[in-house]
């Protein structure tokens, strides 16, 4: 799903606060303490929500991918993504933390992933020695909520604002499994500007790094290409052939009656409404990337 350019310029999205460098160093040290690494991804943007630095940081540690927020993602594409990651050698779990769907499969999946280590513990008479798993993910992929559900607690502060979970903490899941939570970490530069855009669509980067209208223009053009039925159902909009993102935003605003004096469309209001609708799930189950994009 390669997004076509609109006639509105793409802004260069960068967000790498100073604490990110410190966080990376901390993770590089702490990964030595664990048996495996669990990476939480947003099922709507599995490429964009993967930190490309994590592979280098984790080395040869066994890995698990959690495709989170499957309630907001296209089920057919989620299935494709799960198969894609399995063929790459990852254990894969699909979750919706709001309804706890998939959560019960986590501990069994970890034990399967680390079955050889458990067998070695048994051979050494270390039955009961806990497995240690590091949980990583970029800001706002639902990592804290995931950990809360796994551990059955409300201890890891979850907030819909990028970068809110700080510090290091071990969480006891049961007597045989400890989780090491880590702060959300981005990477210094988005090599592909589309990655930055997709992170901005879902709210994984702060809103002040890109103009909302510019973001909405690119997003509505993407909807017109891959999910035209969503535009029709939600905004009563049939996208004219060849219309760019700004024109589509104006048409949607007109349909909504978002007008200012003189009959001009309030595109700023429409842009905010569009992005709010997407982030709250009102546009339905939409996935913005497919495994074919990795080829």
Language-model segment annotations:
Residues 1-36, 44-53, 57-63, 76, ...:
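Helix-rich effector regions associated with P-loop NTPase G domains
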Residues 41-44, 70, 150, 183:
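Anionic group-transfer/hydrolysis microenvironments
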Residues 64, 70-136, 155, 257-259, ...:
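Canonical P-loop GTPase G-domain recognition
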Residues 105, 109, 145, 218, ...:
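Alpha-helical scaffold segments in soluble metabolic enzymes
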Residues 117-121, 148, 154-160, 226-231:
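Short, structured loop/turn "capping" segments at alpha-beta junctions
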Residues 132-152, 156, 182:
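Glycine-rich phosphate-binding P-loop
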């Amino acid at each position: 799903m390669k997004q076509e350019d609109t006639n509105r310029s793409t802004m260069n999205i960068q967000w790498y606060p100073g604490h990110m460098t410190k966080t990376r160093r901390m993770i590089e040290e702490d990964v030595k303490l664990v048996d495996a690494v669990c990476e939480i991804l947003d099922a709507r943007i599995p490429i964009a929500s993967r930190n490309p630095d994590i592979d280098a940081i984790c080395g040869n540690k066994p890995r698990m991918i959690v495709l989170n927020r499957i309630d907001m993602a296209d089920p057919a594409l989620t299935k494709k993504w799960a198969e894609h990651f399995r063929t790459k050698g990852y254990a894969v779990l699909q979750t919706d933390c709001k309804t706890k769907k998939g959560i019960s499969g986590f501990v069994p999946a970890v034990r399967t992933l680390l079955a050889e280590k458990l067998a070695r513990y048994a051979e050494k008479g270390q039955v009961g020695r806990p497995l240690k798993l590091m949980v990583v993910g970029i800001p706002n992929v639902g990592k804290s909520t995931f950990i809360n559900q796994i551990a059955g607690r409300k201890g890891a502060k979850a907030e819909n604002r990028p970068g809110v979970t700080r510090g290091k903490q071990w969480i006891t899941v049961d007597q045989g499994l400890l989780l090491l939570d880590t702060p959300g970490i981005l990477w210094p530069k988005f090599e592909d500007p589309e990655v930055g855009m997709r992170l901005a669509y879902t709210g994984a980067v702060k809103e002040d790094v890109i103009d909302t209208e510019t973001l909405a223009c690119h997003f509505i053009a993407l909807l017109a290409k891959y999910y035209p039925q969503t535009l029709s159902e939600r905004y009563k909009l049939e996208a004219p052939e060849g219309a760019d993102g700004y024109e589509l935003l104006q048409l949607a605003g007109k349909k909504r009656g978002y007008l200012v004096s003189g009959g001009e469309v309030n595109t700023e209001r429409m842009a905010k409404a569009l992005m709010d609708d997407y982030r709250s799930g009102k546009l339905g189950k939409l996935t913005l990337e497919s495994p074919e994009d990795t080829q």
